[in-house]
Structure formats: C-alpha cells, structure tokens
Amino acid sequence: MKSETGYMGFVVVLVFMVLLALQLATLSAPATQIAYSDFRKLAAAAQLDDLEVSPTRITGVLRSASAAAALPASDAEAIKRAGTPWRFSTKRVTDERLIDTLAATGTRYRGADDDTWIGTLASWIVPIAVFALVWNLMLRRPRGGLQDWSGVGKSKPRVYVEAKTGIDFDDIAGIDEAKAELQQIVAFLRAPARYQRLGGKIPKGVLIVGAPGTGKTLLAKAVAGEAGVPFFSTSGSSFVEMFVGVGAARVRDLFEQAQQKAPCIIFIDELDALGKVRGAGLASGNDEREQTLNQLLVEMDGFQANSGVILMAATNRPEILDPALLRPGRFDRHIAIDRPDLTGRRQILSVHVKHVKLGPDVDLGELASRTPGFVGADLANIVNEAALHAAELDKPAIDMSDFDEAIDRAMTGMERKSRVMSEREKITIAHHEAGHALIAQTRAHSDPVKKVSIIPRGIAALGYTQQVPTEDRYVLRKSELLDRLDVLLGGRVAEEIVFGDVSTGAENDLERATEMARHMVARYGMSERIGLATFGDADTQGLSPLVWQRGGERCSESTATRIDDEIQRLLAEAHDRVSRTLKERRGALERIAGYLLEHEVVDHDKLVRLVNDEPTPEPGARDPGGDAAKRSGIGAAPAKPPAEVGSAELRDPARKADNADHSVPQ
C-alpha cells in the first residue's frame, strides 16, 4: 500500500507532462498564411499534400522546399523559417473546380470542421481538470507515503481483532516454561478485576528474548488468541522514516489506538531496531531513532499498569537494548526462550506433522534425537522438506527415508550430484573422514557417530562425519573437550599417516580445534601453566553472533605469548594422541576408508562392525523401529558452551564463503 502511494506523485506529474506535451505539439510548427491564388498554382502543379478542407479554411503542407519558389518572397521565407513540415494555410473561397484539380493531381485531402472557442477551451480545461482530480485523490488517500503529508505520522500496525490471530497455546510446543509465565498475562486480560481487587499491578511490558526461529512472535500471537483481545502487531523498523519526528508521532498514534481498544496487546517485533542503546553514534544528539525511543519510554511511563494495554516485544539481541527500556516499570518481565531439548523437539514435531500424512515407520522420538540444537523453525522446515521429497517420489505417505534426506539437507546442504571428483580426491576424502570416525569411536567422552559420508553436499563440504550427542548437556568437562580436540584432528592425522602428506581439506577442522583450545586456556582456566585467570573476550555477544561485537584480549603481550604457547601445546599433545591411536588401529582405518570408497556412506552399526573387524552386511533397508539409533544411544541436544562439535567436514579450499558447521546448527 505504501509503495502504491509513493507512485502517486510521479504518476500525476507524468500525466500532466504528457498532456502538456500533446498540447504543445498541436501548437508547434504554425501554418504560414498564403493567398488563395498562390494556393491554386501549387495545387495545379501537384506540390501540395495532406490537405485539410474546412468550410472556411484550407491547411496543408508543401511537398518540398522548392515548391515555395512559386510563392512571393515573404511567404517563401516564412515557410522555410518555420521548418519542416512546410505548413501553410489559406482562406477558402468558392471554387467549384478545386476538387477536380486535386483529384487530377492525386493530392490527398480530407474534410474538417471549423475550430470553435468551446473546443479550444476544452483542449486546455480537460487536462488541467484531470491533473487536479488525480492530485486531490492522492491527497485524500491516507496511506502514509511520501506525498501523504497528513498521514505520515500515523502508525499502521496490523490489527487482529478478538481471537482472529488463529493461534493459541495449543499451537505452541516445546516452550512450556514461557507459556506458564504468560498465563498470568492471559488471565489478567480475561478478568482484570480479579487482580485490581487486591491491588495487584500487571506488568506493563513483557520482553521475549530468544534465538531466531524459537517462536517469539508465535508466542505473542498465542497470548492474544488465548485472551481474545485485539492484537496490534508492528516492527521496530516501521517507526523510523526519513522525516524528523515521524517515528515519535507514530509511537504516540499507536498507543492512542491501543487505548481506544483496551484491553489489548501491542506487539513490537525486532525491538532492537528501535531500542538500541542511546549515545552510540557520532550524531546521536539529532538521531531520529533516539527521538523515537525517547517517545516510547515516555508512553510506557504514561499509561497505567491496569489500563488493559500490555506491551510485548521480541528481540534476539537483548545486549544492545537501552538500559532505560529494560528497567522495572517498563519491561517488567523478561521471558527467555531457549532452544528446545529432546522432549521439546518431539512436541514441536508432533505439532507440525498434524497436517501431513506419515508412514507407519516414522518415529518422532528418533527424529527429535537426531536434531540437537534445532529450533522450531528448523523443525518445521524439516517436516516440509520431507513432505516435498516424498511428493517428488510419488509416495503415498512420508516415511523415515524422507526425513533422513531432509535432516541431511538441513545439516550439510543439498547433495551435489553434479560435482565429479577424481579417484585420488575420493581416496583422500575417504581416509580423512575415516580418521574422524575412528577417533570418535575410540574416545570414551566423544559423541556417537551417526553417519559418515563422502558425498559432496552444500557449498563446500566434500565429506562429513555426523555426530549426535547422547543427552542434554550444559557443562563440559576438560576430558570431554580433549576428546573433541582429538576428533577434530583425526582427519588431518589420518592423511599424514596414510599418504605422508596433508591436504587443504582440514582447514575448518584446524580453525575449530584452535578456537576450542583457546577457550580452554583463556576462558575456562583449564591450563595449569596459565592458571585460573581468564583472558577471554568480554561477553557482549549475547544471541547475536557478530564478530565485530567482540573485544580484544585483556592481557599483556607476555601473557598473550604464553597463551599462544599453551594453545600450541594442547594441539600438539592432541596430535600425538591421535597419531598413536591411528597407527595402532591402522587396519580399522583402512576398512572404514575402503567401505566408504565402495558405498560412500557408513551408518553407526556398520561403523561399529568395521572398527571391531566384524562381518558387514551389504547396505539394505534401514533398521525398523529405529533400532540402530537405540543401540547407539543417540539422544538429545548439544551442550551450550562451547559450540558443539557436531561433525567434522572435509571442505573444498576453493569455497571459503561458508566455514560454519553445517551438521549441527548452533
């Protein structure tokens, strides 16, 4: 609607210019008056064309400049000066032979009516009237565009009246704690007298904080749907325009609309676009965004706690919000939505599969265990991708193989069937991934390996080793981190042992291993030589993984050198441990690599048999009922800090755009 209004001024000006040009075109090249006798000579000589014969006048053009030679010098000069076409005009006299002459010389002519003063006036009045009408319509349409000066300060939130949000708490799963906290808000909106009778004050504002895709907006709509009250939905970026004072005016207008429909809910999505901490810019004194934020603070102080208007907002960057916005009395209640655990993921999947047709072999528990770290939006996407995959194969229902493909695609990207690798590269990749898988199987604190593949996927992954945590963990021990270092270096060391050379494919492994070792030394106090002091970056990152928000090392140069030396020591010790293991288990390494070269994919059960040198059956149908997953003890979500080692990938060195771990979203 706003873009349509933005076109209006341009359209009006364009129409006016076109009409004006047409008028000027009719007035251009004025006709030169000549005598009728000269006209008769030119007609007899066949020097005329395009005649227009009216009851009182005859107009036309000369066929060439040389035809003007038959005219008096003054008329000839006037015609030439006017330029092409050489137009002339003469007063018509009674001449019965004129038509015969024109017919004999083959001159084109047509009849016309005389111009009247009414026609001339209409030719000017009509364009002006059209212009005025369009301009008036534009001004009277309150769309808030650049030409709509009267409505530029009006807020235009989406308003869902009563329970028409279409969402209630039954549509929300996996975040039971957040729903429980909001039950009080719903109860107040349904029966405010219950709280006012005892003098209680409902929170003025509720701030929902969570990573992208965790369901913040959905939760706010569910509150309105449960309470059955109007729901004003807008975003933080919609308040700020190019005009000074527009944002503040829209904030005032939004709260005025809400007061008229109380009890109701105002929901501002992406609050960080509006509520950033003030004074951070060079021109902060005249910053339009700061004026808008100031007005929001004033409005939140202005309406009463029991007025029935509740402000809800959502953000995934709470660390950059202004402290004045977060104090009690404004956003009194902060609700954090974390990534769902195993039970939460299963509940979320059960909601999303209600509208799809599932096969008898689909096990939501196994799917939940295979998607650690996934948020609600990720799980919804997996269900949709599985449905699309099944539809492409014309299946009557979605089975586990469709979900397997959807999960692999979400973790590592689309399978790159068009990428053709040489036999030498395949051998390198197979031994690299075999090294990761073998070390993961031999370490007591390593997560089980779900799948090993040398099929290229995504932008840069040439192969991957997919690990899935066995349980929800929020604290990691030093022994677990050391085992993870070993797994990350398994691919690189395997190349050294088998080929006596190394490749560029371990780039991502080395980056992650170095980062993990740095955290152990500088943040977690896991180095005896450095001690218990921490020298890590200030924790300003919050939920937004932006590198520019991180500070530098808070230590002296000598301490930084010692930290670097300790990181090198940890990596060197991990390298030695991995090297000893792979040399001792060289046979298992070759068996895994050989199986990968033949079949391209190894699942958990086959990997265990290959490591233990047991007979390996040919690849066939997957174990019914998720037996493989049950035997492997595959469980739930990754630990929080540090980032989960979900997979080790061999990456294409020519594609450095994506160095993130595709296997387990963080």
Curated annotation (Swiss-Prot):
Parts of the chain on the Cytoplasmic side: 1-6, 138-666
Positions of region (Disordered): 612-666
EC number: 3.4.24.-
Cofactor dependence: Zn(2+)
Binding, Zn(2+): 432, 436, 509
Subunit structure: Homohexamer.
Official protein name in the record: ATP-dependent zinc metalloprotease FtsH
Organism: Burkholderia pseudomallei (strain 1710b)
